[in-house]
Regions:
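Internal gly/pro-rich beta-alpha loop/helix module
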Residues: 134-135, 140-232
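Low-acidity, Ser/Thr- and Arg-rich intrinsically disordered low-complexity segments
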Residues: 4-9
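Small-residue (G/A/S/T)-rich helix-start motifs and N-terminal tracts that mark the onset
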Residues: 12-98, 106, 135, 192, ...
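Conserved Rossmann-like nucleotide-cofactor binding loop
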Residues: 75, 102, 176
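N-terminal small/polar loop signature for handling phosphorylated ligands or for N-terminal nucleophile
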Residues: 84-163, 298-311, 315-316
Length: 498
């Protein structure tokens, strides 16, 4: 088991709230709920839930200078109701910096704070108030945002982000993030996000996830449970707490634990071959065979370790005896012919790193892979891969563009696509899982080679490709978290920790 600090959604309501929805679906959930629960009641309940979260969190003191950034719509109304609720709980340093209300609910909440000990800050004093705040609450914009933030709100967000001493809370999602908002736009940088009903998928883009902070707390502002359960899901929010090391049968022997082949390494990048092959072995593979080219063979023989058999690539004439194959780590260029031969074995194949470049070239020339396939690009590799095959960079656009594009690639290639970042996304045939990791210690050279070896091992043990990818990511992050508790570490230490 992993400790309770592993990144699992904190849900003070129900276990089905680990589903993710789009901003449009969140708006529909809100509208549907309002047919049964008045909108003002939902807003009041949201404020109460957030106040309870603050009280339980223990990070905010009663006399802290707490500044609320209040937008013109219902997110601003939530912020005002939240401020009033905290006033009722005995918090004394409450201030609000407000834009002109445009929604009726925001106007009601603006009037409602008049008789509470909440100080209004004029716009000309905004900079001073933001700089001196000990807690900043972002209630500027919510799920209805469809364009980059500009004007005074943009200035306030930039100023708030610059206040490194303040504890920052985002209501529903950090302002500046949305399905259709370019990820290069400014966004509020929260330490914790209180999101309503269900978490939003746009919060899990590689470029936006850090803005949500280390903790995302899912709260229910009295949405009827059946509406939450029935809400269409974009994907599932997974936890490394579910990591499982595959058990071995008491009568297991080396062949029953999976025989895997690895095509990796070159004269310039010999370390990738060692890391991926050792990771496959330590993850549980019974037989690991590393195929190296002529240039890297001498290094591979001495560095791969006694547990790995090393062969010349020319000896790989019969791949039928292997249960799964990994191709690409440290390969270099010009490996298209070899990759095609590997893919035509119809064995489960993991394609990583330079193998993705070779695969893109094959597909552009008309080749279509057939057989179980797992692709493991990092952000830069997916950007180049999508540009080559789809004619557009799906990573540096909007959160929706990434979800649409990665699903399109998975469908087009019949593959599981694993996007490696602070949030791992695992995608196949409309199924999408998000593994929220945020473990910077694991962001080290060779970490991806280790992950590829783990997934290879699980494929070799007959796990279905999607499950092999998901469980591989969980194990990778779990071990990384355990090592990270003791400080920074190398990929070799990560592989040995398996």
């Amino acid at each position: 088991m992993v400790d309770s600090s592993t990144r699992k959604p904190k849900m003070w309501y129900s276990s089905y709230m680990d589903s993710l929805i789009s901003c449009a679906q969140a708006q529909n959930l809100d509208k549907l709920s309002q047919k049964h629960v008045p909108a003002i009641v939902l807003m009041e309940q949201a404020a109460c839930r957030m106040s309870q979260a603050v009280e339980r969190g223990g990070r905010v003191k009663k006399d802290d200078a707490i500044l609320f950034l209040v937008g013109p719509g219902n997110n601003g109304g939530d912020a005002l109701a939240f401020a009033r609720s905290l006033a009722c709980c005995g918090y004394s340093g409450l201030q609000v910096l407000c834009m002109e209300p445009r929604s009726e609910l925001c106007r009601i909440q603006s009037e409602a704070i008049a008789d509470f000990p909440i100080r209004r800050i004029s716009h000309d004093k905004a900079g001073t108030a933001i700089d001196s705040a000990q807690v900043i609450v972002d209630g500027l914009f919510g799920v209805g945002l469809s364009r980059p933030v500009d004007g005074a709100a943009k200035e306030w967000i930039a100023r708030a982000n610059a206040n490194s001493r303040a504890w920052k809370i985002a209501i529903d999602l950090p302002s500046g993030i949305g399905d259709q908002v370019p990820v290069s736009s400014i966004s509020f940088h929260a330490d914790v996000t209180y999101t309503m009903g269900l978490a939003k998928s746009c919060m899990f883009h590689p470029a936006t996830c850090a803005s949500c902070g280390r903790e995302i707390v899912v709260l229910n502002p009295s949405f009827p449970p059946r509406f939450i359960e029935a809400c269409p899901s974009v994907g599932s929010w997974e936890s490394i707490a579910s990591a499982v090391e595959p058990p071995l049968r008491l009568d297991a022997f080396k062949n029953s634990r999976g025989s895997v082949a690895i095509f990796a390494g070159s004269r310039q990048y010999s370390g990738a071959a060692r890391l991926s092959s050792q990771a496959a072995f330590h993850a549980g593979s019974g037989l690991v065979t590393l195929f190296a080219d002529r240039d890297s063979f001498p290094v591979a023989v001495t560095s791969a370790g006694l547990s790995v058999m090393v062969r010349h690539e020319e000896e790989a004439f019969d791949l039928s005896r292997f249960d799964a194959i990994l191709a690409g780590p440290g390969w270099g260029t010009g490996r298209e012919a070899l990759l095609r031969r590997i893919l035509e074995s119809e064995k489960p194949v993991v394609v990583d790193a330079d193998g993705l470049v070779a695969l893109a070239n094959l597909v552009r020339d008309g080749y279509r892979p057939h057989g179980p396939l797992v692709l493991t690009p990092h952000v830069g590799e997916l950007s180049r891969f999508s540009s080559a095959l789809l004619g557009r960079d799906i990573v540096h656009d909007t959160p929706q563009a990434l979800l649409t594009g990665i699903s399109q690639l998975a469908t087009q290639l019949g593959a599981v696509v694993v996007l490696k970042s602070a949030v791992n996304q695992i995608v196949k045939d409309g199924r999408m899982a998000f593994l929220d990791c945020k473990n910077p210690a694991i962001a080290v050279a060779g970490s991806g080679d280790v992950l590829a070896g783990i997934i290879l091992c699980l494929l070799g043990q007959k796990l279905e490709p999607f499950e092999a990818a998901l469980q591989g990511c969980r194990l990778h992050q779990w071990k990384g978290k355990l090592l990270g508790a003791g400080g920074y570490f190398t990929s070799q230490e990560l592989e040995e920790c398996l």
